[in-house]
């Protein structure tokens, strides 16, 4: 289907040229064909993004600073190319073009996050509401709806307000629960008449483990003996404290939405979790147990409270009094606090049992007593992508979904991220940089794995590819590219469809 509105001439030419290239570029011989028509009726396909990685306009439109602004500017050495998200993919200015790209591919939905500090520059109601920020997101939502694309909104994708970090250490304080709830309520009031799917938090595991255990992500806290070279932190306590407060903020926000807005707005609300799949390093009971502990410490950390009202038994046993406890009231509040679960899957690891530590230097990174690796006996679990942590293992996608089905009562699931990156090779001519056949293979095989899980009863209702565009990839900066559309960082952030964009367009034909 043609995109509404005129496409820039260069972009149109690229589409026409690549339509020829893409038609035969990826040889899927040996793999069953897959398309939209393979999936259940009403299944949603979309792409995903996040505010700090995409928007830019960091100092425009009344936006206040987030912890990622501070982290990238004060610690450029922690970013591979010393870059930041000041401009990012410039979706703050180019959002209409982004929506045209989605529409042209035939995408049903777009998952994006709201920048908390674009709504509340100082993080709380006391600092005032930024009307320019409200206007920007209204414009984006209305543009999406005018092109037939459903908005799925994430309220928090790691860019918490620096003002709240300064005031009470952000998510280390229970004070953030009410401030987050106030922020969420503004979004429900302003956008909820048109937005029918809400996600409170994106990947609390990543935020808490990288932000408070290793110090590799904002706010850059860790114990002094960790490799993150942090000036402050406690890797054995703070990750658990921060994520405890995220779970409580999530649950309070869900209660608010269900009590005041859901009946009128008729939307749904959930949370996005991430998990790798874990394969025992060898066929031993100790390594089987290590794989189970690994998934408990990454996924069960959040899923167990949401389903059962408490943390996994393995975490309670190994972390002890460093793991916060839920009161009876909190347990009841968190349990069942979702309409759906967003699930992000990228990769798998082998899990190898570790003996108990000496009790010194406690850290989330070693509490699970599982050594995680992508390589066994010199052989990787799957092809390695540009990011050193990302090994391609489609089978794990199916295994994870069936694990969720069998262990957590088969909740409604949306795959809110799935994707792969390549290196940003600045020497490649544009036409070569658009040939991302490895990404097409990744999507083809993962969609087949997803389809297999659905046929075996997994209750999955939608799939969002990560990502619509190349973008600022956190500590990797702009050294890797996850987009199905190429962003030219040297020429006004122009967008060019990669082969995978054409593949998706063909896949999504109705």
From Swiss-Prot:
What glycosylation sites does the entry record? 122, 229, 361, 371, 425
Q: Which GO terms describe its cellular component?
A: extracellular region
Kindly give the InterPro entries that the UniProt entry links to this protein.
Glyco_hydro_1 (IPR001360), Glyco_hydro_1_N_CS (IPR033132), Glycoside_hydrolase_SF (IPR017853)
Catalytic activity entry: Hydrolysis of terminal, non-reducing beta-D-glucosyl residues with release of beta-D-glucose
Keywords in alphabetical order, please.
Disulfide bond, Glycoprotein, Glycosidase, Hydrolase, Secreted, Signal
Task: Give the molecular function GO annotations.
Answer: beta-D-fucosidase activity; beta-galactosidase activity; beta-gentiobiose beta-glucosidase activity; beta-L-arabinosidase activity; glucan exo-1,3-beta-glucosidase activity
Which residues constitute the catalytic centre? 203, 417
Q: List the disulfide bonds.
A: 208-243, 222-230
Q: Say which enzyme class the record assigns.
A: hydrolase
Name the positions where a beta-D-glucoside binds: 53, 157, 202-203, 346, 417, 466, 473-474, 482
Gene Ontology biological process terms in this record: carbohydrate metabolic process
- Give the EC number(s) under which this enzyme is classified: 3.2.1.21
Where is the protein localized?
Answer: Secreted
Check the UniProt entry and state the signal peptide residues, or none.
1-24
Pfam families, from UniProt? Glyco_hydro_1
Q: What's the stated role of this polypeptide?
A: Hydrolyzes p-nitrophenyl beta-D-glucoside, p-nitrophenyl beta-D-galactoside, p-nitrophenyl beta-D-xyloside, p-nitrophenyl beta-D-fucoside, p-nitrophenyl beta-L-arabinoside, cello-oligosaccharides and laminaribiose.
To which protein family does this belong? Belongs to the glycosyl hydrolase 1 family.
Q: What is this protein called?
A: Beta-glucosidase 12
Question: In which organism is this protein found?
Answer: Oryza sativa subsp. indica
């Amino acid at each position: 289907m043609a995109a509404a509105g005129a496409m820039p001439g260069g972009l149109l030419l690229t589409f026409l040229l690549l339509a020829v290239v893409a038609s035969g570029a990826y040889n899927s011989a040996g793999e069953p064909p897959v398309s939209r028509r393979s999936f259940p009726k009403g299944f949603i396909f979309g792409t995903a993004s996040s505010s700090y990685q995409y928007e830019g306009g960091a100092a425009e439109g009344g936006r206040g600073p987030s912890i990622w602004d501070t982290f990238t500017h004060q610690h450029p050495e922690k970013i591979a190319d010393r870059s930041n998200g000041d401009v990012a993919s410039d979706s703050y200015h180019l959002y209409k073009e982004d929506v045209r790209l989605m529409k042209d591919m035939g995408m049903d939905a777009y998952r994006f996050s709201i920048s908390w500090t674009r709504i509340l520059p100082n993080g709380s109601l006391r600092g005032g509401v930024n009307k320019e920020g409200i206007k920007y997101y209204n414009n984006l939502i209305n543009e999406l709806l005018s092109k037939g694309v459903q908005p799925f909104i994430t309220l928090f994708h790691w860019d918490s307000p620096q003002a709240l970090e300064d005031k009470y250490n952000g998510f280390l304080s229970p004070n953030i629960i009410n401030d987050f709830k106030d922020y969420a309520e503004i979004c429900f009031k302003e956008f909820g008449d048109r937005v029918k799917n809400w996600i409170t938090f994106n990947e609390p595991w990543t935020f808490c483990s990288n932000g408070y255990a290793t110090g590799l992500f904002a706010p850059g806290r860790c114990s002094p003996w960790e490799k993150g070279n942090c000036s402050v932190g406690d890797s054995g306590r703070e990750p658990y404290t921060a994520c405890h407060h995220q779970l409580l903020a999530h649950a309070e926000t869900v209660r608010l939405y269900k009590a005041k807005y859901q009946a009128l707005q008729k939307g749904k609300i959930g949370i996005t979790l991430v998990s790798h799949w874990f394969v025992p390093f060898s066929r031993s009971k100790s390594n089987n147990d290590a794989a189970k502990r690994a998934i408990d410490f990454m996924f069960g950390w959040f899923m167990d409270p949401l389903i059962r009202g408490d943390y996994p038994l393995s975490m309670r046993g190994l972390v002890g009094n460093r793991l916060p406890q839920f009161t009876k009231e909190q347990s009841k509040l968190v349990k069942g606090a979702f309409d759906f679960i967003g699930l992000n899957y990228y990769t798998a690891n082998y899990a190898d049992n570790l003996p108990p530590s000496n009790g010194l230097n406690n850290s989330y990174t070693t509490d699970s007593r599982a050594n995680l690796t992508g390589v066994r006996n010199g052989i990787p679990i799957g092809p390695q992508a540009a990011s050193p942590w990302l090994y391609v293992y489609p089978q794990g996608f199916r295994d994870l979904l069936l694990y969720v089905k069998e262990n957590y009562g088969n909740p409604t699931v949306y795959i809110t991220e799935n994707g792969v990156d390549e290196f940003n090779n600045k020497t490649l001519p544009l036409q070569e940089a658009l040939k991302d056949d490895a990404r097409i293979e990744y999507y083809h095989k993962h969609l087949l794995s997803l389809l297999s899980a659905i046929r075996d009863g997994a209750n999955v209702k939608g799939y969002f590819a990560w990502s619509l565009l190349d973008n600022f990839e956190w500590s990797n900066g702009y050294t890797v590219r996850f987009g199905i559309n190429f962003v030219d960082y040297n020429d006004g952030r122009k967008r060019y469809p990669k082969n995978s964009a054409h593949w998706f367009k063909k896949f999504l034909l109705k």
